[in-house]
Amino acid sequence: MNIRSNPDTTRPAVTTGALPSSQKIYVTPDAAPDLRVPLREIILSKEAAEPNLPVYDTTGPYTDPAITIDVNAGLKRPRTQWVLERGGVEQYQGREIKPIDNGNVSGEHAAAAFKAYHQPLRGVGDSPITQYEFARKGIITKEMIYVATRENLGRKQQLERAEAALADGESFGAAIPAFITPEFVRDEIARGRAIIPANINHGELEPMIIGRNFLTKINANIGNSAVTSSVEEEVDKMVWAIRWGADTVMDLSTGRNIHTTREWILRNAPIPIGTVPIYQALEKCDGDPVKLTWELYKDTLIEQCEQGVDYFTIHAGVRLAYIHLTANRVTGIVSRGGSIMAKWCLAHHQESFLYTHFDEICDLMRKYDVSFSLGDGLRPGSIADANDRAQFAELETLGELTKIAWDKGCQVMIEGPGHVPLHKIKINMDKQLKECGEAPFYTLGPLTTDIAPGYDHITSGIGAAMIGWFGCAMLCYVTPKEHLGLPDRNDVKVGVITYKIAAHASDLAKGHPAAQLRDDAVSRARFDFRWQDQFNLGLDPDTAKAFHDETLPKDAHKVAHFCSMCGPKFCSMKITQDVRDYAAGLGDNEKAALYPAGHVGMTISGVIEDGMAQMSAKFRDMGEELYLDAEKVKESNRALS
């Protein structure tokens, strides 16, 4: 159930407790008996006569009744020990937190600082630090074992049945094995086709993997602005987003208290946290892009690396030479980071410092294993601008930068559009795979039409499902508030559920060997009128039950063999069940009266097959002519009867 923790003992208050009819379970992998990998088990009714269903779980300790949540203290940090055991790192006194890090806020406007402080770690020497470096050296890390276990969903015994059901999936070149092994994970990371975003300073993290040969992931954006929101609201939104299935969360804060907000989020986040560092750097120079400097930006990167941010969106592909390509666009440059860098380039008439200092950025991020999310600063902001030269020029540059980052030992994924009509989506996926060496693709939607403000979670969910099918590894959610305002708690939930649908639809279409198991479980519950199971197996049990209860609220209605859509007399599933029950109860004499002579005891398919054989013989007996005399046909029919 949903429990709002007491704000007197936990600040801020967050939602805890298990989802309806669910329990947290842990799997211990053979390769690392000391690991406990979380899954959510959906408990089915006794009437189901089938095992409970394990599903992927992003909720962290917030749904484990055995763990006491104290937001002030933050989550436990078991991953820190994994990092220390591997060696190659040092603990050091991090940079001093300065007033400018929080926008020089003071007095009543200053948010309370997070009390606990952990000295940061950084890599030293030539020893491998990043998951990419370990993978390239043939070393399987605990993070790799952990994500392999998560991806299998604890369903090894059921995979044979799932594979047979999904033999018709179209993977478009993805190669998803029946069972994910740690070695497969290592190989995918070594090839650059997958990443485990996991800063060595994010000890609270439960590792996850992003790549097209794994489950399609989703990201939820949160963050305050200069206009609205607070630390409390953003931490609550983070916990709320992962409750409904967000695999990663990006903190896109742009107002005051940016450092403090991020610290509260990270210390309570069991999932990877991403940021766009240029936003905070801009706040440090009073919001004027012209005043940005490489030194200021670098200091911001170090600040966020030490805090534990797992991936950075860096718009290093917005080059001076590409800006003029956006001049004839309907909506110009719509990316905040892209527009900031474009203005800086034009004001100084210089190449972007993100591009010219890219090698140095790689060296810095490698020390902390912060993954690149190479930003699409020139993405199309309208259907009219989709797939134009500006967009693809930047993508080609991102491909060049990807190879540099790999050479430096860094993990990389690529951000994509945006606003793209259905018929132009596949070329985006194909070009990204070609230009960027199959590095994971991470897209915002794309939105497939521009006519539905207030419903852009739907316009984008359509495109997200399609590009996920084509091979996109992670989908960034869009909420109903897109283009209209900062999303609130309910908008976050709607956005996450919409994108969980899109991601799951993608996995089904690709032929992921475990995807259909949940669909089949829902379908069986639906046909058997197990209403509670149907609710609980869904992505949003609360909403499903609430809709049902609007018209049939009584407990007795939860066992009724109909709903308010068709009523008891016109329910197709009940009629089908009645026909089956009737057929099963027939005696031999009754069956003989219903079946043609010689067919008693045969299945329906057998009767049909026998009848088809008779008609084939009849066609040959009558000379194999297409058009026959009617009287001859009547005579032949009388002979058969």
UniProtKB/Swiss-Prot annotation:
Q: How does it assemble?
A: Homodimer.
What GO terms are given for molecular function?
Answer: 4 iron, 4 sulfur cluster binding; carbon-carbon lyase activity; zinc ion binding
Chain sites annotated for binding [4Fe-4S] cluster? C563, C566, C571
Q: Give the source lineage, highest ranks first.
A: Bacteria, Pseudomonadati, Pseudomonadota, Alphaproteobacteria, Hyphomicrobiales
Protein keywords: 4Fe-4S, Iron, Iron-sulfur, Lyase, Metal-binding, S-adenosyl-L-methionine, Thiamine biosynthesis, Zinc
Query: Which cofactors does the annotated protein need, by name?
Result: [4Fe-4S] cluster
The record's disulfide annotation reads none
Functionally, this protein is described as follows: Catalyzes the synthesis of the hydroxymethylpyrimidine phosphate (HMP-P) moiety of thiamine from aminoimidazole ribotide (AIR) in a radical S-adenosyl-L-methionine (SAM)-dependent reaction.
Q: Where does substrate bind?
A: N221, M250, Y279, H315, S335, R336, G337, D376, G377, L378, R379, E415, Y442
Gene giving rise to this polypeptide: thiC
InterPro entries listed in its UniProt record: ThiC, ThiC-associated_dom, ThiC/Bza_core_dom, ThiC/BzaA/B
PANTHER family associated with the record: PHOSPHOMETHYLPYRIMIDINE SYNTHASE, CHLOROPLASTIC (PTHR30557:SF1), THIAMINE BIOSYNTHESIS PROTEIN THIC (PTHR30557)
Give the family, as the similarity comment puts it: Belongs to the ThiC family.
Instruction: Give the Enzyme Commission number.
Output: 4.1.99.17
Q: What is this protein called?
A: Phosphomethylpyrimidine synthase
Biological pathway:
Cofactor biosynthesis; thiamine diphosphate biosynthesis
> Which superkingdom, per the lineage?
Bacteria
> Which GO terms fall under biological process for this protein?
thiamine biosynthetic process; thiamine diphosphate biosynthetic process
The keyword S-adenosyl-L-methionine belongs to this UniProt entry's keyword annotation? yes
The protein's matches in Pfam families, at most eight in alphabetical order, are given as:
ThiC-associated, ThiC_Rad_SAM
From which organism does this entry originate? Answer: Rhodopseudomonas palustris (strain BisA53)
Q: Bound how, and how many: what does the cofactor note say?
A: Binds 1 [4Fe-4S] cluster per subunit. The cluster is coordinated with 3 cysteines and an exchangeable S-adenosyl-L-methionine.
